[in-house]
Swiss-Prot record:
One of its GO terms (molecular function) is structural constituent of ribosome. It comes from Aspergillus fumigatus (strain ATCC MYA-4609 / CBS 101355 / FGSC A1100 / Af293). It comes from the Eukaryota. Gene3D superfamilies: 3.30.1230.20. One of its GO terms (cellular component) is cytosolic small ribosomal subunit. Coiled coil: none annotated. Belongs to the eukaryotic ribosomal protein eS21 family. This is Small ribosomal subunit protein eS21. PANTHER family: 40S RIBOSOMAL PROTEIN S21.
Length: 88
């Protein structure tokens, strides 16, 4: 599809699950996108944020909280969170 300037644009850009790297299909109505804000030492929003997309497969298995903790720990938003996957 083209816009008014004649540039090619897509109507749908597929997202990938941040936890599994699976492509999230258009009909996956259980998927969510969560934005985590970066704050300074005073707790004020710095204008930066990180978005995580979780597919319905992860949410249906009940692994979304552990996956989000793992992703936030990897990116440096949280520290020292207990994880069931590390205990095995």
């Amino acid at each position: 599809m083209e816009n008014e300037k004649g540039e090619i644009v897509d109507l749908y850009v597929p997202r990938k699950c941040s936890a599994t790297n699976r492509i999230i299909k258009a009909n996956d109505h259980a998927s969510v996108q969560i934005s985590i804000a970066k704050v300074d030492e005073n707790g004020r929003y710095t204008g930066e944020n990180q978005s995580y997309a979780l597919c319905g497969f992860i949410r249906a298995r009940g692994e979304s909280d552990d996956s989000l903790n793992r992703l936030c720990q990897r990116d440096g938003y949280i520290r020292n969170v207990w994880s069931a996957s590390r205990q095995r």
